[in-house]
Amino acid sequence: MLIKLLTKVFGSRNDRTLRRMRKVVNIINAMEPEIEKLSDEELKGKTAEFRARLEKGEVLENLIPEAFAVVREASKRVFGMRHFDVQLLGGMVLNERCIAEMRTGEGKTLTATLPAYLNALTGKGVHVVTVNDYLAQRDAENNRPLFEFLGLTVGINLPGMPAPAKREAYAADITYGTNNEYGFDYLRDNMAFSPEERVQRKLHYALVDEVDSILIDEARTPLIISGPAEDSSEMYKRVNKIIPHLIRQEKEDSETFQGEGHFSVDEKSRQVNLTERGLVLIEELLVKEGIMDEGESLYSPANIMLMHHVTAALRAHALFTRDVDYIVKDGEVIIVDEHTGRTMQGRRWSDGLHQAVEAKEGVQIQNENQTLASITFQNYFRLYEKLAGMTGTADTEAFEFSSIYKLDTVVVPTNRPMIRKDLPDLVYMTEAEKIQAIIEDIKERTAKGQPVLVGTISIEKSELVSNELTKAGIKHNVLNAKFHANEAAIVAQAGYPAAVTIATNMAGRGTDIVLGGSWQAEVAALENPTAEQIEKIKADWQVRHDAVLAAGGLHIIGTERHESRRIDNQLRGRSGRQGDAGSSRFYLSMEDALMRIFASDRVSGMMRKLGMKPGEAIEHPWVTKAIANAQRKVESRNFDIRKQLLEYDDVANDQRRAIYSQRNELLDVSDVSETINSIREDVFKATIDAYIPPQSLEEMWDIPGLQERLKNDFDLDLPIAEWLDKEPELHEETLRERILAQSIEVYQRKEEVVGAEMMRHFEKGVMLQTLDSLWKEHLAAMDYLRQGIHLRGYAQKDPKQEYKRESFSMFAAMLESLKYEVISTLSKVQVRMPEEVEELEQQRRMEAERLAQMQQLSHQDDDSAAAAALAAQTGERKVGRNDPCPCGSGKKYKQCHGRLQ
C-alpha cells in the first residue's frame, strides 16, 4: 500500500526514465525544421561530421539529439516514414544498455535504425540479432536504403556463407544475423588455425530483436560445435527393441493405476527412472538379447555405457513425442523449438538422446558427437561491450534481465491507446469439450466477418484443431514448423475478413497481422502493377479494413496456456496493434499439460465441488488465479534452472576465456620459440624431479627410470649412468643443466636441417593442435563432472563449490599436460634432408608396386577391370593417417608429419 502511494507521488522508475528522455525528444523535435532544410548531400555529410567529432573526443551521448533527427529526416526521404516520438524514446532506451518493451505493431524495426546508426558511427560495428534467417534478411534489405543513404554499409551474416563473405559482412558498419550464427562464428574463430580464417571483429554493440526469446527461452540451450565420436548405432537399435516391453508406473490415485510399473516419469524435471521391478525385467531382456552376460548387474561399472543407452531409450519413448518435440522429415529427426514452434535444422540433442529417438523412429542413426567447443547464449552476449534488446513482452522477465545481464527494462508507451478486450479464461473438464467450444466460437466470429487466429503450443495440437475445423467445413490456414515456407504469406493475409489461421508459437513473430489483409502483398503478387491497379487494391483494402474493425478486429484464441505468461502475452499481442480493435480468450481443459502437472488437484477438486456437467465451462477468478500461480511456479523453476546453468557455465566460461585469449595471442604471433624454450625448462625440471628429487641423496635417484623416460617421451638417448660412473663429482644441479643442454642441442640440429622458418611454423602448429586436442578432452571431462556433481550434496558438501574446486584442478592439470605434450611431440619429430625423404618415398612406391603385381598374379581369374582398379589403388595410394610415416620414424603418419594437415 505504502509503495503504491509513494509511486503515485514520485512516479515509478519507468516513469522517471521516460520523463528524462522526453526532454531529449523535445530537443529532437525542435531540430526538425533546421534538418529538413538540408539537401540530400548535406544530410549524408552529417555522418562524416559526427565521426570527426567523435575522433576529437566528443562523447557519443552528446550526438543523440542531432543523430536521431538526421535518421528521422533520412527515413522520411527514403521510406516516406517519420519516426513517432515513442520510437525516439525506444531508440534512446536501446542506446542505454536497456531492454525496450514495445508492443506489437509499434515499429520496432524502424526504432532499431536509431541506435544502430548512432553506435555505427564509432566504426566498431553493430550486430543486429534476429531470431531467424528470414527476419535477418528482411530487416537488412528493408533498412539498407536508409543506411546507405546516410553513408553506412550493411552486411548480412547467414549460415553456410563462405569465410570471405562472412568477413565482409562483419566488416560492415551494421551487420544483421541470427543469434545462432553469431555464436557459432565466435566458436569457429576460436578454432581457426590462422588469423586470416577469423571472421568476427571485437564484439562491440549487440541490438537483440525479440530479446526474450533469445536471452531467456534459448538460454538453457548451449551452442555446441562437435565432431564425430565412435559409432554405437547398433547398440541404440538393440536397446530400442527392449523398451516397448516396459510398462509406465502411474500414480496410485490415477484411474489407470494397475500396480507397480517398470519405470516412473517425472514430467516436471523430464526424467525417467527404473523401478525395482523394471530393473529386474530389463536385466532379463538384456541377457536374453545377448547384450549382457548372465548374473551381471546393469548398475555395475562395466555396464555404465549400457545404462546410458537404456536411459536414453526410455527418455526417447516416454518423454519425447513426434510432432510435438520433433518431426520426421526425409528420413531425419528434426527438433522443434518448444518456445517458437520452429524446426531447428542441424541441431541435435546430446547425451545420446537424438540417436535413441532415431532408433525409435526407425530412421538412420547418425554417430554420436564429441564437443569441440561450446558456449551458452548467456555468456556469449555478455562478451559484448554494450548490449540492448527489444520485445513486445519483457516486463514479466524484468528481474531475470536485471540479475543475469544487468539490463534494466523500460516499458515504452504505445503510440495510440490499447483497446483490445482480453476475455477471462474458460476451463473445461476434457480436451474434446474444449475443442468443441473453440469450434463454436470460431463459427460465431467468422459469421460476422471477424478474422480469428488460433494459437496452439505444438504441431500435434495445431493439426488436431485443423482436422476438427475441416470436419466442421470451416476454411482455414495452418502455420507450423511443417509448413513454415509460406509463413509470411499466411501471416500477411491472416487479417482478411472471416479468415481463420491456426499457428504454433512461431505465429509470425516480426510480421504484423494487418486488419483487412496486406495490400502490399497483393501489389507484390502482380508483375508490373499500374498506378490504377495499386489505387484499386488500396481502395478494396480500405473497405475490408473498415469491415473487420466493425466486426471487432482480430480475435485471438489460445487453445491452452503456455508454461510462461510471456508467451501467452505474445499471442495476445498479435491483436490490437496501433490502437486497433481486437479481443482474445484462452480455452483450457483439465487434460492440458500445464493443468495436469502443476494445477490439477486444486482446480479439479474445485470443479467437482461445483458439480459441472459435460460441455460446461468454468469461468471464475479463483481458477484464473490458480492457473496464474501454476505459471508462476513454472517460470520460477525455469529461472532457477537457467540461473544454476549459468553459475556452472561461469566456471567453464572463465577457463574458456583464458584458453581463447591464449589461443588468439598464439595465432597472432609468428615466432613462439621463446615460449617453447621456457616450457622446455619447466617440463625437463618436472621430469627430472620425478626421478631425482631435489636436494636428495644419490641413493634415492632412479637413473634407469629417468633414462627410459627421456628415451620414450623425448627421444633422448643419454648415458646418464655412464656420466655418473666416470664423473663421481657430478652434482645434481650440473647433471640437470647437462640434460637440458643436450635436449636443446639435439633440437637445434633438427632446426638446422629444416630451417628456422619451417621450425617456427611447425612449433606453432603443434601448440595449436595440442591445445585444441586437450581442450576437447577437458570439455568432455567437465561434462562428466557436471553430470554427477549433485551427488556430493549427500556428503554435506556444496556441489557448486566442489565443481569449482575440481574443475580448477582439472584445468591446471590440462595446462601441465599441454606443456608436456608440446615438448614431447617437438622432441620426437624426425627430420631428414629432402633427398632422404625422396629416396624413402621412392622405395615405398617400388614396394607398393611389387605388392600390386603380386596381387594381380594371384587374382588372374578376376575381372581385368577390377584387377586394374586394385593395382591403381594399391600402387598410388595416399598415406593414410594411421599408416607408418614415410619419413621412417616408425610412428603413425598422423602423429608425425601429418600433425599439421
UniProtKB/Swiss-Prot annotation:
Biased composition (Basic residues): 891-901
GO biological process: intracellular protein transmembrane transport; protein import; protein targeting; protein transport by the Sec complex
InterPro entries xrefs: Helicase_ATP-bd (IPR014001), Helicase_C-like (IPR001650), P-loop_NTPase (IPR027417), SEC_C_motif (IPR004027), SecA (IPR000185), SecA_CS (IPR020937), SecA_DEAD (IPR011115), SecA_motor_DEAD (IPR014018)
UniProt topology in membrane: Peripheral membrane protein
GO molecular function annotations of the record: ATP binding; metal ion binding; protein-exporting ATPase activity
UniProt-annotated binding residues for Zn(2+): C885, C887, C896, H897
Keywords, alphabetical: ATP-binding, Cell inner membrane, Cell membrane, Cytoplasm, Membrane, Metal-binding, Nucleotide-binding, Protein transport, Translocase, Translocation, Transport, Zinc
Cofactor(s) needed by this chain: Zn(2+)
Co-factor remark: May bind 1 zinc ion per subunit.
Cystine pairs: none
Region (Disordered): 859-901
Record localization: Cell inner membrane; Cytoplasm
Chain positions recorded as ATP binding sites: Q87, G105, E106, G107, K108, T109, D512
Reaction catalyzed: ATP + H2O + cellular proteinSide 1 = ADP + phosphate + cellular proteinSide 2
GO cellular component, one term: plasma membrane
Top-level taxon of the source organism: Bacteria
Family as reported in the entry's similarity comment: Belongs to the SecA family.
HAMAP family tied to this protein: SecA
Purpose: Part of the Sec protein translocase complex. Interacts with the SecYEG preprotein conducting channel. Has a central role in coupling the hydrolysis of ATP to the transfer of proteins into and across the cell membrane, serving both as a receptor for the preprotein-SecB complex and as an ATP-driven molecular motor driving the stepwise translocation of polypeptide chains across the membrane.
Subunit structure of this chain's protein: Monomer and homodimer. Part of the essential Sec protein translocation apparatus which comprises SecA, SecYEG and auxiliary proteins SecDF-YajC and YidC.
Name listed for the protein in its UniProt record: Protein translocase subunit SecA
Gene: secA
